[in-house]
Amino acid sequence: MNFDNLEREDEQIAHLVQKEKERQENSIELIASENFVSKAVMEAMGSYLTNKYAEGYPSKRYYGGCHVVDEVEDLARERVKKLFGAEHANVQPHSGSQANMAVYFSILEPGDTVLGMDLSHGGHLTHGSSVNFSGRLFNFVSYGVDKETETINYETVRELALKHKPKLIVAGASAYSRIIDFKTLREIADEVGAYLMVDIAHIAGLVATGLHPSPVPYADFVTSTTHKTLRGPRGGLILCKEKFAKVLDKNIFPGIQGGPLMHIIAAKAVCFKEALEPSFKTYMEQVVKNAHVLAEALEAYGFKLVSNGTDNHLILVDLTNKDITGKDAEILLDSIGITLNKNTVPNETRSPFVTSGVRIGTPAITTRGFKEEEMKEIASIINDAIKEKDGDLEPLKARVKALCAKYPLY
């Protein structure tokens, strides 16, 4: 991209933008919630649409001059409905957290009981964490993973639902590597008269391409981000049954947001179009293949994988047998050019700022073109770095740079 105007106007910011570009180009990105957008998505984000304020919805705006952005938003809505087979879509949420908030405000009152996945077992802050608005406003009861299998035990979820009679059951996760059974969760919700909301922020790309079962036929509401496996701009979206469309839209605007970000909605529309192409399914298939190979390679080096593997794009690694914390592993690997994040593991004994594990994802490196052989090399580099954490890391930095040079970012 051309940043001539930025360089003339603000050298400091232009310099930092360039530094970040170089960091991304010369690092192996394993953060499961990150990806690299296409140039088309990036151009939409930096377009003239950023100038337009458009409170309301297409044909029902509070400002004039919205006929063009109405077309943009309609395109985004229609494309994402086609992508997921949904009855209604709202593409205005600024983030996944705000998408979840809008659903809660649509069907809950403060103090209502909600069943959601424990953050330390792979859930998300907005699924009831006490430090988040969700845990402060609503009475969340948490379910987790089985101590032995480290996967969701649906009978335990059912028992909790029968005991606490939640008004809403929340499914989905930020660090869960296995298939989620939405049909069974729908049956549990029906048994106790609860709504079902599924947060597919991490697995949206897999769901869109049929590589993970879709929650759309079963859930009352489906929320997502657009910047993870969907490979779009940072933002959120909500899908729902038509009967909830009016109340949902009201709880985005005027409920929790004002004017939508029309340049971001345009970029969402572009990413939905890209996701409808056959090449996107090929990409997502490679994401999953890469995750499987990377998981197997790490396991061969003696790393303990939570639930012993993965069905999707991410791997949760328990480092308790490697004499290193998640925090120290994150810092160590960052120093050689591999970026990932510390993460709690089931039955965690350390604080969330230290943790016993790391979370690894393959979407971003797959976007660059990395395939199975590169996964084996990445596993080898990670293993060598942790084994030689107090030694000379320069050879490992060189191996990382060699991989990055082989697959340019843009």
UniProtKB/Swiss-Prot annotation:
One of its GO terms (molecular function) is glycine hydroxymethyltransferase activity. GO terms for cellular component: cytosol. Signal peptide: none annotated. The modification N6-(pyridoxal phosphate)lysine is found at residue 228. Its main location: cytoplasm. (6S)-5,6,7,8-tetrahydrofolate binds at residues 119, 123-125, 351-353. It is found in: Cytoplasm. The record marks 227 as: Plays an important role in substrate specificity. Gene3D superfamilies: Aspartate Aminotransferase, domain 1, Type I PLP-dependent aspartate aminotransferase-like (Major domain). InterPro entries: PyrdxlP-dep_Trfase, PyrdxlP-dep_Trfase_major, PyrdxlP-dep_Trfase_small, Ser_HO-MeTrfase, Ser_HO-MeTrfase-like, Ser_HO-MeTrfase_PLP_BS, SHMT-like_dom. Keywords: Amino-acid biosynthesis, Cytoplasm, One-carbon metabolism, Pyridoxal phosphate, Transferase. Pathway: One-carbon metabolism; tetrahydrofolate interconversion; Amino-acid biosynthesis; glycine biosynthesis; glycine from L-serine: step 1/1. GO terms for biological process: glycine biosynthetic process from serine; tetrahydrofolate interconversion. Its cofactor is pyridoxal 5'-phosphate. It holds the Pfam family SHMT. NCBIfam families: PRK00011.1 (NF000586). Belongs to the SHMT family. Homodimer. Catalyzes the reversible interconversion of serine and glycine with tetrahydrofolate (THF) serving as the one-carbon carrier. This reaction serves as the major source of one-carbon groups required for the biosynthesis of purines, thymidylate, methionine, and other important biomolecules. Also exhibits THF-independent aldolase activity toward beta-hydroxyamino acids, producing glycine and aldehydes, via a retro-aldol mechanism. This is Serine hydroxymethyltransferase. It comes from Clostridium perfringens (strain 13 / Type A). The gene is glyA.
